[in-house]
């Protein structure tokens, strides 16, 4: 991967210098249906994650954009029909108007579902932030992305990772000149645990609120290169206004 360029991998958090390193590494298998807001974006295969924020809208990363998406909800094993899933096609897919595919600033996208989903114990919404979370807040990251830092192991079962929101100064020091005010770092400077390919667009939930969207990083789970996430608290007005207008 060109170290001078960001590469938005289809179905992946943007990661370099290693293409195959964007997944949840060092996490654990989530308890079945314990993450009812987690969705899988599918175009014949799982390519990104997302979060259900009301019965007809999903939020994901803009670098996951495709013209047609099937949203799969109530999933745990994405390769087996378990009987609890709901599959709904997209009606509208709206990238943030200021999304920059080179810098990945404003890496956020809304998907309107063709019909409302049925909310239940296995399909539920996650709250938008009421305020921005402070550094040190413990968060939960989830996804079906690769589980290896080197090599590929795409899991069938949803994976989880508990990780702290890092100080912005540490985030900026890890990626000099790359971090905007719309980005946060979540994870471990010592490496070993991170999101990776296939997790992109998925949730970072802190104290029951969606504070982050899996966006990009340098490799996966590498020392001094924590995962970078879209700072959702900066976009609550845009989300609400866009939903109201559509």
From Swiss-Prot:
Residues making up the signal peptide according to the UniProt record: 1-15
PROSITE patterns referenced in this protein's UniProt entry, alphabetically = TRYPSIN_DOM, TRYPSIN_HIS, TRYPSIN_SER
GO cellular component terms, alphabetically, are: acrosomal vesicle
Q: How would you describe the post-translational modification of this protein?
A: Proteolytically cleaved and activated by an autocatalytic mechanism. Cleavage by CTRC inhibits autoactivation.
Q: Which GO terms describe its biological process?
A: proteolysis
**Pfam family membership, one:** Trypsin
Site described as Cleavage, located at: 81, 122, 150, 193
Q: Which residues form the propeptide?
A: 16-23
Task: Specify where it is mainly localized.
Answer: cytoplasm
Q: Does the keyword Disulfide bond apply?
A: yes
Domain Peptidase S1 residue range list: 24-244
Cell location: Cytoplasmic vesicle, Secretory vesicle, Acrosome
InterPro entries, from UniProt?
Answer: Peptidase_S1_PA, Peptidase_S1_PA_chymotrypsin, Peptidase_S1A, Serine_Proteases_S1, Trypsin_dom, TRYPSIN_HIS, TRYPSIN_SER
Q: Which reaction does it catalyse?
A: Preferential cleavage: Arg-|-Xaa, Lys-|-Xaa
Q: What is its EC number?
A: 3.4.21.4
Q: Which UniProt keywords apply?
A: Autocatalytic cleavage, Cytoplasmic vesicle, Disulfide bond, Hydrolase, Protease, Serine protease, Signal, Zymogen
Q: Which GO terms describe its molecular function?
A: serine-type endopeptidase activity
**Record's function text:** Serine protease capable of autoactivation.
Tell me what this protein is called: Trypsin-5
Name the gene behind this protein: Try5
């Amino acid at each position: 991967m060109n170290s001078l360029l960001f590469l938005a991998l289809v179905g992946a958090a943007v990661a370099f210098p290693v293409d195959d390193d964007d997944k949840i590494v060092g996490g654990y298998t989530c308890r079945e249906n314990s993450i009812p807001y987690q969705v899988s974006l599918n175009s014949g295969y799982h390519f990104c994650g997302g979060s259900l924020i009301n019965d007809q809208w999903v939020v994901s990363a803009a670098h996951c954009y495709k013209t047609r998406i099937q949203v799969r909800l109530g999933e745990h094993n994405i390769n087996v029909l378990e009987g609890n899933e709901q599959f709904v096609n997209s009606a509208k897919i709206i990238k943030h108007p200021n999304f920059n595919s080179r810098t990945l600033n404003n890496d956020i996208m809304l998907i309107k579902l063709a019909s409302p989903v049925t909310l239940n114990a296995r399909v539920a919404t996650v709250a938008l932030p009421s305020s921005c979370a402070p550094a040190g807040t413990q968060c939960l990251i989830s996804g079906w992305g690769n589980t290896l830092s080197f090599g590929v192991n795409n899991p069938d079962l949803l994976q989880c990772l508990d990780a702290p929101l890092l100080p912005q100064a540490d985030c900026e020091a890890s990626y000099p000149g790359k971090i905007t005010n719309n980005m946060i770092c979540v994870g471990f400077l010592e490496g070993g645990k991170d999101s990776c390919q296939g997790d992109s667009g998925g949730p970072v939930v802190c104290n029951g609120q969606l504070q982050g969207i899996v966006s990009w990083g340098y490799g996966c789970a590498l020392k001094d290169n924590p995962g970078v996430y879209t700072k959702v608290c900066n976009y609550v007005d845009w989300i609400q206004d866009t939903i109201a207008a559509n």
